[in-house]
Curated annotation (Swiss-Prot):
GO molecular function: 2-isopropylmalate synthase activity; metal ion binding
Source lineage: Eukaryota, Viridiplantae, Streptophyta, Embryophyta, Tracheophyta
Transit peptide: 1-55
Subcellular location: Plastid, Chloroplast
Recorded coiled-coil stretches: none
Activity-pH behavior: Optimum pH is 8.
Signal peptide: none
Modulation of this protein's activity: Inhibited by EDTA, Cu(2+) and Zn(2+).
Catalytic activity line of the entry: 4-methylsulfanyl-2-oxobutanoate + acetyl-CoA + H2O = 2-(2-methylsulfanyl)ethylmalate + CoA + H(+)
GO CC, any one term: chloroplast
Protein name: Methylthioalkylmalate synthase 1-1, chloroplastic
Entry note: cofactor: Strongly activated by Mn(2+) and Co(2+), and weakly activated by Fe(2+), Ni(2+), Mg(2+) and Ca(2+).
Amino acid sequence: MSFSPTYSIVMASPLLTSSQMIPTTGSTVGFRSILPFGSLRLTRPYKKTSLFISYCSSVSKKAKTSATDLKPVVERWPEYIPNKLSDKNYVRVYDTTLRDGEQAPGAALTPPQKIEIALQLAKLRVDVMEVGFPVSSEEEFETIKTIAKTVGNEVDEETGYVPVISALARSIQRDIEAAWESVKYAKRPRVGIFTPTSDIHMKYKLQKTREEVIEMVASSVRFAKSLGCKDIQFGCEDAGRSEKEFLCKILGEAIKAGATAVNVADTVGINMPEEYGELVRYLKANTPGIDDIVFSVHCHNDLGVATANTIAGVCAGARQVEVTVNGIGERSGNAPLEEVVMALKCRGAYVMDGVYTRIDTRQIMATSKMVQEYTGLYVQPHKPIVGANCFVHESGVHQDGILKNRSTYEILSPEDVGVVKSQNSGIVLGKLSGRHAVKDRLKELGYELDDEKFNDIFSRFRDLTKQKKRITDADLKALVTTCGDEKLNGANGKESNGYVPVPQISSMV
């Protein structure tokens, strides 16, 4: 990912914080700039873009000349205060893959799988992980307790990071007791309590009046507090269809009773980004005590706008986002963690007043693949951020640009999300590929051809694309073989991008 061209950087150390190490393959270490994470923080914009570009160029040159001296920047995690953030621009990432995500049809996980995913989520550096609904079964209760005792107590010695472990409960005392008893072993335990707040839910599910629901919520929060829980989140189920004035009242009572965070859920995914953002703004402006807690957003994807709604909530002032890996969840799923996090990383500084997270985005692909494997829910190839086609190009025009500079058609670096790629390893040859891409791939395979021979091969390549959707390296070698003599660059061929070197070839007829 490149820097936003209109913002300046404040660095504790001009050299050490200009880049971070990125593990690649073997002993190779790559360097790239990361913004706005770690000690790189965005401040005021430069008045002239040229000044910013000039500054970045000087930083880049220093990094290149001193690469062997650079060390990874380690930043201490700020003190965790349940109802406050150390920085008004910091956005907490609340992952609910192990609770809401597991509710996706067919996504049931075994206890060992849930524990492994929790460990991976800790590597990803999520702030909060909601790991289940303990009252649902004894197995669920014990699994949550195990995660609380293990993952919830593994403190990173260098950074001080340890995740908040949360369990969900209805506004029922036995639910709340089960939730607290399962998570209390964690260093940072949280109990999440939810209650329906829309008229349709209160009438048909709860069969209670608004006044009765408000009292139920307040007493539930007080009960959780009486158990010793100091981190209590209250969530409004179906807030997207709830009356705004009623939401202000019930949230205010929950805060008054001791809630440290409140969650406004578009449970059925009915809201559009503009109206969801307006809802968040309204609640933040009219709810008593709202500035004394952390405001959270939870969006479902029934109309395909969960990511957009979540971002709209952040723009409106929310500072906790509730997401799932790969967007799995009930019906059409939830806001995908990878999309929300990368949107904040890529555009948070530029159009969202400098908001950021502390997610280690290099763990995104590994986390996505683990969740796919364990749930059996595999993402489509063009799924943003983690799909197989995200960093792959077939169009000739695009391939030409990518071969010259990847940033021509990629706004994110593959390495940013844990995908190691070279300059042209995302090139896929097919009917839309142009001469530049084909010639470059042949050269990487070890073939240097004059224009006449290449023209012959390219013509045959075009014919082959009418029979096959994708042309492989083996296909290219066969095309060269059928076209007569060619000159190898190197006695044993060239090894590139993980491909097997081409064997030495003598003149072929």
